Amino acid sequence: MPVLQRISLTLVLAAILGGCSSLPEGIDHPAEPYTSYGPSTLSVLADEYQPQASEQATTAVRLQESGWDALAQRLALVESAEHTIDIQYYIWNSDESGRYLASRLLAAADRGVKVRVMLDDINLNEREGLLSALDAHQNVEIRIFNPTPTRRGFSKWLSFLGDFSRLNRRMHNKSFTVDGTLSVVGGRNIGDEYFDLSDEINFRDRDVLVMGSVVTTIQTSFIEYWDSRWSYPVDMLGDDEQPDLSKIDDITVPQYKNYPELPLDRETADSLLKEVLNEMTWVNARFAYDRPVPVDSDNTDEPKATAVLLGQLASESKQEILLESAYLVFDDGQLEEWQTLNNEGVEIKALTNSMASNDLVTNHSAYAGRRYDMLEHGIDLFELKPDSKLCQASTQDVSKCAPETAYGLHAKSVVFDRSIASIGSFNFNLRSTYLNTESVLIIENKAIAEMLAKTIEQAMSEDNSWRLELEDGDVYWYSGDQNWDSEPETGKWERMQSGFLQLLPIEKYL
């Protein structure tokens, strides 16, 4: 069969599958009755840490740099929960940390806590059975964002093609809010590799524990997604089998070397939270997020709200912008804006993954195709080394770092003029700019911004990253006295793959 004929047949099948889908195009959710809750242990605890007197500093923050911090504080919040837990993630892995956290959510539900979990569909990987088992609990409700109508095998991807403009838009937001009082937002998903627990790859990542006025906006964002027409109850997606609670048996507690035990009960949770709250900084902050459903899903040329906000903050910078992004891709218009800033004297430094530290060659290819242009437009580039010293500093466990375990960058942060910091789910690439929904916490505080700037600069040092330069029209990688004219610590096959992918018109989708 000729190639064009095969392509035509595929598209016809996709259209048929899309038209015969078993899911409605959207859900009209009934309005839920408002429930007023009294004070909780967390709200009483938070009240004890209110600022002395400030009309602007109404939000308290503490950065979560290590995987232990990120998992321990989430678990402490769950153990202390009394009324509600609202969770929104792009990925929730069915691994040690993912299963254990799920088991503690069930324990919270057993004591009467209302648990709501919102997950994107693209990475469910046929785990509807497990999620339906959790959803069967009377106090647990799980919804899936923007699911494919066909759930299994090759036909799933055909249905994806049949409704590409809608299904290509993914929910990348991340939040974890308990009793409407404390929340965790940032770059991490739920899974071993985000908590320094994986034996395959671990990520440098960053979240923020927040309390105060901005939590109301985070909660509003969650409800907007929860009630959106692209939000589907998980029991609509699976088969009609009885939910099997044995799917969440055999739960083990994750173990860290050289860190305290994770909080396993209310007493240790309260103790940890008191310690953490005492270390929080009161700041002026705002939480920005994209709307869940675009007015026109076919329009992929308009930047999302989070992209516009970050672009505005960049344009207002006078001295320096420090970027840290797992994926880094700018289009021609954005590059011209960076060039204008550079011409005005703004120093722009960006840290991203090297090919050797990136777990996705496809994503790296989009960056590699724009790398020369970025350097030419005044952006100083740094690429993370896979054996970065940052890993051991975070994990305190050499077995979780290279060469035994791969190490990559997943953080998404930026510092403007060492006075404003942004931490969130937004990668500085075209998918975050035009397609995904994202969320960011903007912190206006010089102490926090300076601390984050120093953390990013440390990651850019020669112990941790390669520095890139243009010489005679070619890109070179530098580390101390050494230099390379091709991507360090990579093979020809990887570079060939990347080069081939750069020829395809898929830059916006990576």
What are these regions (language model features)?
Residues 1-9:
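Bacterial N-terminal signal peptides that target proteins for export
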